[in-house]
Amino acid sequence: NDLPAFWHEKNSLYFVDEIETLEDDHHIRRNLNLTYAIRDGIISHCGEMNQKSIQKRNEYIELKDYQYPGQYNPYTWEGCVVKMSDKIAYLARDIEDALRLNIIDEKQVEQLKKEINMISSYHFDAINNGTIVNYFILDVCQNSSLEKGICLSDEAFEVMKKMMSFNYKNIYLIDRIEVHTNYVQLILNSIFQFLYKYETIAKENQINVIEALKEDQKKYPITIQGY
C-alpha cells in the first residue's frame, strides 16, 4: 500500500486528534481537543536520541508535517522533560524485564554494574529501575538550566550511553529477539493487510468499513468477530 511507515509518536498524535473521545457533562462523547503544547509533547517525545541536552524550540510547527521521529525538539520545557524522561524510563526497566524473561542473567548485570561504577562518582549497589531512575532524575535537576536546557552531566551521559550499549548488545539485537520480532511483524502485517483490504472494498462500494466486514463474517468468523 501507499501508506507511510508506522512510528508510534505520530500514531499517538493521530489517535488523540482523530479517535479518542471523552464524555462531557451531557454524556456526549467529544474529541479531546488537546492544546498545542500537549500535542507537541506527544509527537516530539521520542527518547531514543543520543542527546545529552534538550533545548526547546522557539518556532511554531504544524505538527502533522513531522516526517520522522525526533525531527524537532519540543516547543515547551515540559515537553523537553517528557523527552528526557522517555530516554531514562526504559533503560533499567528493559534490563529488569530481560532478567525476568531469562534473556540476560545476573552475571551480565553484575558486570554492567562494575563498568558503570568505574565511570561514575556515584556508587551503584544495584542496577534496577528505582536506582537508575533516581540517579538520572537527581542529575537532571542539578545540571539543567535555561542556558543548557534539560541536561545531563557529562558523567551521567556516559552512564546512559554505557547502559544503552549494554541493552542493544544483550537485549534488543540478539537472535532470540529478532526471531520474535519477525514473528510479531508477520502477525501484525497480516492483520493489517486483511483489514486494509476491507477499507478499499468499503470505498469502492461507498459503504462503511464495518458493513464490509459484516458481509464476510461467515468466511472469517474469528478474525472479524475479534475485530
Model-derived features with residue positions:
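Active-site-proximal cofactor/substrate-binding loop regions of enzyme domains
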Residues: 1
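Histidine-centered, transition-metal-coordinating active-site segments
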Residues: 5, 10-11, 15-227
